[in-house]
């Protein structure tokens, strides 16, 4: 099953791209709610390069790593990556109100489509 989320960021494409691909920026926005945060992020932004984000509950009760491998990069336009046996694509589309950031990803069987869409959308909305 394919799930898509998107948001519009009122900034120029170069700033949006940098914020999406720079570890120092990722730790600022990559959280689904105020009680979670990203404590560390790594990015090797090239095809075959890897990325990871350590996401933790602020109370220390739980955490997990989100990691994958970049499979295609078109600067300022598109990022494709694999994470486990799933894939995702991120599109950056400049428009009159800013840049639309659209993420399409393969869902997983553990959580409902609504839960997955809601979680990914909440993270993207922080961007």
Regions inferred by a protein language model and the residue ranges of each:
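Generic structural detector for well-ordered beta-strands
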Residues: 4-10, 44, 54, 69, ...
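Hydrophobic ligand-binding cavity/cleft-lining segments
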Residues: 1-35
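Hydrophobic pocket/interface hotspot
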Residues: 16, 26, 51-53, 70, ...
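Generic alpha-helical structural signal
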Residues: 10, 67, 121-125
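Glycine-rich portal/gate segments that line the openings of hydrophobic small-molecule binding cavities
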Residues: 37-81
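Intrinsic-disorder/low-complexity, polar/charged segments enriched in Ser/Thr/Lys/Arg/Asp/Glu/Gln
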Residues: 2-6, 13, 38, 50, ...
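Beta-strand/loop substructures that line and gate deep hydrophobic ligand-binding cavities in soluble
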Residues: 77-122, 127
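Solvent-exposed residues in well-ordered beta-strands and their adjoining turns
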Residues: 8-12, 56, 73, 93, ...
